[in-house]
Design a protein with these regions (language model features):
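Conserved alpha/beta catalytic core and glycan-binding cleft of carbohydrate-active enzymes
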Residues: 1-170, 182
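Glycan-recognition and catalytic regions of carbohydrate-active enzymes
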Residues: 58-70, 127-129, 133-142, 167-238
Length: 238
């Protein structure tokens, strides 16, 4: 979230998660632009191009989600292998009110294209459990708290979603599963989706391509450039 490139200098961390990659692709895949996605709602293809070429999208620009406060530091000088990219992870799914995966939020063709970007770009790809099986089961926010803490977490979570358009109505927020209920945990077990074999084959093919044609050239890799070529299309070169 801070997009602090200083942590990736020599002697620091080898790589860090890049939430900007997830956020801009989520906007392109789902059309959602509420809350922190507002920072990526405008010209998302251009923002994705910057992400692929330079790492962070926000490199000191003001964040609409944070009332214009500047976010991030310059990162274009860093190798793409300093960034960990992902379409889903436990935070981004689990922090959704209903824990939906991209398999139920967008159409398969778009998700296949995004998966190809994830696995064939030089950044380090991160996969979340259930991705390779096309799982459609939710991954909900669940805890094992009790008494006052359990009540505070339950109500605090519902208040948190008041800023999302879909949960502005208190009745809608009442549908958010109780994090402390056993049923919330049980519902979060990943199960193979109806097209699991197709998704496994796609991942197998893309990972093979990555190992054969991408990984041997990652040492010293740097971006040459990237640009948007349409409302949801990007050309990138490394």
């Amino acid at each position: 979230e801070r997009n602090d490139a200083a942590r990736l200098r020599d002697g620091g961390y080898d790589a860090q998660w890049n939430d900007d990659f997830h956020n801009v692709l989520h906007v392109l895949l789902t059309g959602e632009t509420s809350a922190y996605y507002t920072d990526f709602a405008d010209r998302p293809a251009e923002r994705l191009a910057r992400c692929l070429a330079e790492g962070f999208i926000y490199q000191g620009e003001g964040s609409a989600n944070h009332d214009g406060t500047p976010r991030g530091t310059p990162s274009a000088h860093l190798s793409p292998t300093r960034f960990v990219s992902f379409l889903q992870n436990h935070d981004q799914i689990g922090n959704r009110a209903l824990g939906e995966r991209l398999t139920v939020l967008t159409d398969p063709a778009k998700l296949r294209a995004a998966t190809a970007v994830l696995l064939l770009a030089p950044q380090i790809p991160l996969l979340f459990m259930g991705d390779t099986d096309g799982s459609e089961t939710p991954f909900l926010f669940f805890t094992d708290f009790h008494d006052d803490l359990a009540d505070a977490v339950r109500e605090g979570r519902r208040k948190e979603f008041a800023k999302f358009d879909a949960f502005a109505d208190p009745q809608a927020r009442a549908r958010i599963p109780d994090p402390n209920a056993r049923s919330t945990f049980e519902a979060s077990r990943p199960e193979p989706g109806p097209d699991a074999a197709t998704w496994r084959a796609l991942y197998r093919d893309l990972i093979t391509l990555r190992m054969t044609h991408i990984v041997p050239h990652l040492a010293g890799a740097m971006a040459i450039g990237a640009e948007a070529t349409g409302d949801a299309a990007v050309t990138a070169r490394w």
